[in-house]
Regions:
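Helix-turn-helix DNA-binding helix
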Residues: 39-40
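Contiguous, function-dense segments enriched for cysteine-driven chemistry
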Residues: 4-7, 51-52
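Short, cationic-aromatic polyanion-contact patches
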Residues: 2-5, 19, 58-77
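Short, hydrophobic-biased segments on the C-terminal half of alpha helices
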Residues: 44-45
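A short alpha-helical element within helix-turn-helix/winged-helix DNA-binding domains
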Residues: 22-34
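Short helix-capping/hinge SLiMs at alpha-helix to coil transitions
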Residues: 14-20
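A short, conserved structural fragment
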Residues: 48-58
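Pre-recognition alpha-helix immediately N-terminal to the DNA-recognition helix
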Residues: 7-14
Length: 77
């Protein structure tokens, strides 16, 4: 994991611990300060490939550390 990937992962992890729900890409970019949303998305996608972050495509606020478990959002509809 690169230093920037680690920084994004820690931002996601801290967001979960502090607020109890997923950050948006915009939230992560804002916390990072100097990063755009496109760069944030690429890093989050890479973290998903590495298996340290999970998300559901097409559904908002589903970026979460791999250690977080919650009900499948489709079951709740």
């Amino acid at each position: 994991m690169s230093p920037m990937q680690k920084e994004v992962f820690l931002a996601i992890d801290e967001w979960w611990k502090r607020y109890g729900f997923s950050p948006t890409l915009r939230d992560i970019a804002y916390v990072r300060g100097k990063m755009g949303i496109g760069s944030t998305k690429r890093i989050v996608d890479r973290l998903v490939e590495l298996g340290v972050v999970k998300k559901m495509d097409g559904v908002g606020r589903t970026i979460r550390p791999a250690w977080v478990n919650f009900k499948n959002l489709k079951e709740m509809e």
